[in-house]
Amino acid sequence: MSYPDDYSTDVEKNKMDLKEFKEKTQIAELESKVLRLELKNKDISRENVQIKKENEILKRELDKLRIPPLILGTILDRVNERKAVVKSSTGPNFLVNLSQFVDPEDIVPGARVCLNQQTLAIVEVLPKEKDYRAMAMEIEEKPDISFEDIGGLNNQIRDIKEVVELPLKNPELFEKVGIVPPKGVLLYGPPGTGKTLLAKAVAYETNASFVRVVGSELVKKFIGEGAKLVRDVFKLAKEKSPCIIFIDEIDAVASKRTESLTGGDREVQRTLMQLLAEMDGFDSRGDVKIIAATNRPDILDPAILRPGRFDRIIEISMPDEDGRLDILKIHTEKMNLKGVDLREVAKLAENMVGADLKAVCTEAGMFAIREEREFIKMDDFKEAISKITGKKEKCSYDMPQLTVMYG
């Protein structure tokens, strides 16, 4: 059977097209395979680089672990640019050389240094030692109490602003007038009148760092520990300046000195003397201020009350009727009241301090909850006052008075 010439030509052409298509398909497959291999090679290269980095890190860590520990020492004296006398932590003193990596200006008496185990050469200068207990006393987060949240203490707020806040915010005012701002302020008054609250408000209103110390924390068992902690607290305050140091319950460490020969009393007296020395060492126009609080001013040592230490002594007294009304307005601001005359409540709450009034508001709310009401009425406050007054009569407190006042 014979085919036309055109048909034969078409068959040949189709064969060539099919062959060309197969070749292109093979080329495309090969190119795709090459691309996949290149991508895989890149991934392997990246993994290789990452492994090399991890290997280098592990090698460095291993080298660190192989390095022998250094000996700690304290500089006693610098003989010349490259030699110094060091007291090692093991006991004896040594005349040692300085490493070329150590700046001779950093070698001062009292500096902490690291010594090589074999040659005892100084290889590193350490930062000044800080007591972890003093570092823990710094408050990182500001309290959420402002002066607007304190009622009945307008005169006291004005006085503490003049002593603490104004010198920190506007020191030029004192220089223009030509007077030295007070170094510190002592707050005294019955428990619950708002002494600690005022200190919190000062921390909130100023941008200064705030270091809070409780007097009993400064009383330590072993000789010199309390004095060292006092030094570290004041050193921390200077480094963090502008700073406010608040010493709560200062009577625990600043009580009158006696002739007692017991070891505990002598250690408290040493701590007090260190506190007096640190307060005298302050620059009055410096950015460090001291606030102290106590409810026993009668037992404080006269030395700490003299002008130049606590220049201004502020009494946080019992609030009067208007003061109690201001406090009640603050505490009842978010309370659901119906038919309550706060002026009448303030009259009924005679001889109550701010903490008592806050307790009255809380108790009034509890009485409303007990009766399954969503609002508080006048009878709730009357019952709350009777309840709180009964508690106060069981544990009454007579506020001692200062016989001599300074500032």
Curated annotation (Swiss-Prot):
Does Cytoplasm appear among the keywords?
A: yes
| Annotated keywords | ATP-binding, Chaperone, Coiled coil, Cytoplasm, Nucleotide-binding, Proteasome
Listed GO molecular functions? ATP binding; ATP hydrolysis activity
The lineage's top-level taxon is: Archaea
List, alphabetically, the Gene3D superfamilies matched.
1.10.8.60, Nucleic acid-binding proteins (2.40.50.140), P-loop containing nucleotide triphosphate hydrolases (3.40.50.300)
Which residues does UniProt assign to the signal peptide?
Answer: none
Q: Where is this region: Docks into pockets in the proteasome alpha-ring to cause gate opening?
A: 405-407
Binding sites annotated in the UniProt record for ATP? G192, T193, G194, K195, T196, L197, H331
GO cellular component terms? cytoplasm; proteasome-activating nucleotidase complex
Could you give a single Gene Ontology term from the biological process aspect? protein unfolding
Main subcellular localisation: cytoplasm
Q: Record keywords: Chaperone included?
A: yes
Kindly list the places in or outside the cell where this protein is found, as annotated in its UniProt entry.
Answer: Cytoplasm
Which Pfam families does this one have?
A: AAA, AAA_lid_3, Prot_ATP_ID_OB_C
Q: Which residues form a coiled coil?
A: 22-67
PANTHER family reported in the protein's UniProt record: 26S PROTEASOME REGULATORY SUBUNIT
Q: In which family does this protein belong, per the annotation? A: Belongs to the AAA ATPase family.
Q: What is known of its domains?
A: Consists of three main regions, an N-terminal coiled-coil domain that may assist in substrate recognition, an interdomain involved in PAN hexamerization, and a C-terminal ATPase domain of the AAA type.
Describe the function of this protein. Answer: ATPase which is responsible for recognizing, binding, unfolding and translocation of substrate proteins into the archaeal 20S proteasome core particle. Is essential for opening the gate of the 20S proteasome via an interaction with its C-terminus, thereby allowing substrate entry and access to the site of proteolysis. Thus, the C-termini of the proteasomal ATPase function like a 'key in a lock' to induce gate opening and therefore regulate proteolysis.
Q: How does it assemble?
A: Homohexamer. The hexameric complex has a two-ring architecture resembling a top hat that caps the 20S proteasome core at one or both ends. Upon ATP-binding, the C-terminus of PAN interacts with the alpha-rings of the proteasome core by binding to the intersubunit pockets.
Q: What is this protein called?
A: Proteasome-activating nucleotidase
Record organism: Methanococcus maripaludis (strain C6 / ATCC BAA-1332)
Taxonomy of origin reads: Archaea, Methanobacteriati, Methanobacteriota, Methanomada group, Methanococci
Q: Which gene encodes it?
A: pan
